[in-house]
């Protein structure tokens, strides 16, 4: 079933809105993401933090399922003890909601830094914030401090990396399936190699074989 939820803006140029359209399709079951978020929330509790503002592709994908392509715009995932909200640009329309576990807010380009206003709407001001110091630029950190006015902030990137290193049964199953797909591509490349063949034709043989195997498996 497809449902569309597009909040009617209170003004002609809203700072953000929710565009929840279509059926959700995620790489893993909801229980997998719930377990990952439980681990992140434990990290926050142990560090005395109220919320995590994640900005990297790997952490946003790990905790929500959504893998963004920035198109020059910032993306985020805000996690508190009760909420998990992806923050995305309007260029993606309803895709981030369809591809994420949790809520999604779309920010607009009508006013500079609406991205941070959307994050603020989830965290609130004056909270203790965890962020990724190995991904967030100094300029972005300055904007975070300006808009969120955190009581304190701490780098949680090392803790999230340690969590990601511990693979679940579902992750191991997907890794094994991916390796099997790569085997199919490798054999196709081996069979395609012969004197005089172009490199691009060899590469295409491997790609085509893997695409067919992916379609068959997933």
Region spans (language model):
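A composition/biophysics-driven feature that prefers long, compositionally simple stretches
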Residues: 1-185
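Short alpha-helical functional segments enriched in proximate histidine and acidic residues
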Residues: 43, 192, 209-213
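Short, structural beta-strand-to-alpha-helix junction motif
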Residues: 136-138, 198-205, 209, 214
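Active-site pocket-lining segments that scaffold enzyme catalytic pockets across diverse folds
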Residues: 179-189, 199-201, 207
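Short, contiguous acidic and Ser/Thr-rich linear segments
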Residues: 193-197
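Flexible, glycine/charged-enriched surface loops at secondary-structure junctions
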Residues: 216-218
